[in-house]
UniProtKB/Swiss-Prot annotation:
Keywords associated with the record: Protease inhibitor, Serine protease inhibitor
Signal peptide: none
Family statement: Belongs to the protease inhibitor I3 (leguminous Kunitz-type inhibitor) family.
The keyword Iron appears for this protein: no
Protein name per its UniProtKB record: Kunitz-type trypsin inhibitor 1
UniProt entry tagged with the keyword Ribonucleoprotein: no
Role: Exhibits Kunitz trypsin protease inhibitor activity.
Species whose genome carries this gene: Selenicereus undatus (Pitahaya)
Domain of life: Eukaryota
One MF annotation (Gene Ontology) recorded for this entry: serine-type endopeptidase inhibitor activity
Length: 115
């Protein structure tokens, strides 16, 4: 269950804003032991940024490859985590040249548009 800043459950079809708690781009932190749970419904995320995207903030993310996790120590605070694909054809990595971390949403597979 994901809650908004007022402690109410998120509602399908409603708009929510993610506070600026991260940098300008999203990276993958790979874990062999915790791959997370796939989402059961579509989630659309508007990054509001276009500095690193050709399509004015649109991200392509393979289906069921990210999840929302509760953060520790902050009430109603969450983070978006990436679950790497499980098939060998999807396990290509695209490292960021500056940080060496893997970028989220870069794949040659069919993608779901995230707004």
């Amino acid at each position: 269950l994901v809650l908004d800043v007022d402690g109410n459950p998120l509602e399908v079809g409603s708009e929510y804003y993610i506070g600026r708690a991260v940098g300008f781009y999203v990276v993958e932190r790979f874990s062999e032991v915790d791959r997370g749970d796939p989402l059961s419904s579509d989630v659309q995320i508007d990054s509001g940024l276009s500095a690193y995207c050709r399509s004015d903030g649109f991200w392509g993310v393979p289906p069921s490859s990210f999840r929302i996790e509760k953060t520790e120590g902050f009430p109603n605070a969450y983070k978006i985590a990436y679950s790497p694909p499980t098939t060998s054809s999807q396990q290509q990595r695209y490292p960021d040249l500056h940080s060496g971390l893997n970028l989220v949403g870069l794949t040659d597979d069919s993608a779901r548009v995230v707004l």
